[in-house]
């Protein structure tokens, strides 16, 4: 039986982030998603949730476009390459969810902040909050 926690969107976003990080080091979307979703489960033959696959494959497909959108909101002199891999992937995930899903914008921002707190530090969480909040404000 599937744990309710693994089926929550928050947990699926965490899996999506982990899969995106794996993709930075060379694997395919299916393998990265499967590992992130099943790494602590006994039954690894489960069907992957569509939300997880859609997030990861969408970010991968639009990575260049997302990076351009993120770069437009960085301070002068900053490049996307200057950001950590964690920050880059959290921002990509946040911007993609804001622009491509029916998730309320503030929910997408908050989820990215919470992931930053889990996988980085408070300074990174504040940076992600600022950039995504600016992005949302300018998109409206």
Swiss-Prot record:
Q: Has UniProt tagged this entry with the keyword Transcription?
A: yes
> What Pfam families does this protein's entry cite?
NusB (PF01029)
> What keywords are assigned to this protein?
RNA-binding, Transcription, Transcription antitermination, Transcription regulation
Q: Which InterPro entries match?
A: NusB-like_sf, NusB_fam, NusB_RsmB_TIM44
Residues in a coiled coil are none
Q: State its role.
A: Involved in transcription antitermination. Required for transcription of ribosomal RNA (rRNA) genes. Binds specifically to the boxA antiterminator sequence of the ribosomal RNA (rrn) operons.
UniProt protein name: Transcription antitermination protein NusB
Upper classification of the organism? Bacteria, Bacillati, Bacillota, Bacilli, Lactobacillales
Annotated gene = nusB
């Amino acid at each position: 039986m599937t744990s309710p926690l693994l089926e929550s969107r928050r947990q699926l976003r965490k899996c999506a982030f982990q899969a995106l990080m794996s993709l930075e080091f060379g694997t395919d979307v299916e393998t990265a998603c499967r590992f992130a979703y099943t790494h602590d489960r006994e039954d690894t033959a489960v069907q992957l949730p569509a939300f997880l696959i859609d997030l990861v494959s969408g970010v991968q497909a639009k990575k260049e476009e997302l990076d351009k959108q993120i770069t437009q909101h960085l301070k002068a002199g900053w490049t996307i390459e200057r950001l950590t891999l964690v920050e880059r992937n959290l921002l990509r995930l946040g911007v993609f969810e804001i622009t491509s899903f029916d998730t309320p914008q503030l929910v997408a921002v908050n989820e990215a902040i919470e992931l930053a707190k889990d996988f980085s530090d408070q300074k990174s969480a504040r940076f992600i909050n600022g950039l995504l909040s600016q992005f949302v404000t300018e998109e409206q």
